[in-house]
């Protein structure tokens, strides 16, 4: 589960390009919070702080307690705009969390893919899904979905129905889908092909 990040923000009442530039010159980043049937709230964040957290893994699935004018709101990052050259955060969209569950796009970590059985036999580990969309309990939002693939053999597919998700999470789609495959490289032999050729050579 993601640890809850504590951030402070300030309300803003001036809008438009000029106001945004003035904020950035002052070392702050314009942002907005919306969703859950609430009136959108325009805020600003300290630039160095939000850029530091954005550069950490899985920021987009990070649960945040955002303090605005001494009031706390539970939010999630929705979209981040970056400077095209410096990668400094220029604007952030957040969503309010009021429901018990939240739809989330979460990174997938394929643990042991370099040493998977099929890869050791000359196969290629092909990633089909780098992120998956989950329905999660707001108090149990994972940073990622980690899947151990060390025992995955050649010419097989890793399907969603075989994945054990973190507690309180489920796939949004009920339809089965493929996350990864191990396919043979050109010139690579499967174990069965190798045995067959050895048997023929011994005749």
Swiss-Prot record:
One of its GO terms (molecular function) is structural constituent of ribosome. One of its GO terms (cellular component) is cytosolic large ribosomal subunit. Keywords: Ribonucleoprotein, Ribosomal protein, RNA-binding, rRNA-binding. The keyword Signal does not apply. GO terms for biological process: translation. It holds the Pfam family Ribosomal_TL5_C. It comes from the Bacteria. The keyword Methyltransferase does not apply. This is one of the proteins that binds to the 5S RNA in the ribosome where it forms part of the central protuberance. Belongs to the bacterial ribosomal protein bL25 family. CTC subfamily. Part of the 50S ribosomal subunit; part of the 5S rRNA/L5/L18/L25 subcomplex. Contacts the 5S rRNA. Binds to the 5S rRNA independently of L5 and L18. This is Large ribosomal subunit protein bL25. The lineage of its organism: Bacteria, Pseudomonadati, Pseudomonadota, Alphaproteobacteria, Rickettsiales. The gene is rplY.
């Amino acid at each position: 589960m993601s640890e809850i990040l504590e951030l402070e923000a300030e309300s803003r009442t001036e809008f438009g390009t000029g106001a945004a530039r003035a904020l950035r010159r002052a070392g702050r980043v314009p942002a907005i919070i919306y969703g859950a049937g609430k009136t959108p709230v325009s805020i600003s964040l300290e630039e160095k702080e939000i850029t530091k957290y954005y550069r950490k893994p899985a920021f987009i699935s990070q649960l945040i307690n955002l303090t605005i004018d001494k009031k706390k709101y539970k939010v999630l990052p929705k979209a981040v705009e970056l400077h095209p050259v410096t990668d400094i955060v220029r604007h952030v969209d957040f969503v309010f969390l009021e429901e018990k569950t939240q739809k989330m796009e979460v990174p997938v970590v394929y643990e042991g893919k370099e040493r998977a059985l099929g890869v050791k036999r000359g196969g290629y580990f092909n990633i089909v899904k780098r992120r998956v969309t989950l329905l999660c309990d707001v108090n149990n939002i994972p940073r990622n979905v980690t899947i151990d693939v060390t025992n995955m053999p050649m010419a097989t597919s890793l399907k969603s129905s075989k994945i054990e998700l973190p507690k309180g999470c489920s796939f949004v789609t009920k339809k089965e889908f493929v996350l990864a495959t191990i396919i043979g490289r050109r010139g690579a032999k499967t174990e069965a092909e190798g045995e067959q050729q050895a048997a023929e050579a011994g005749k």
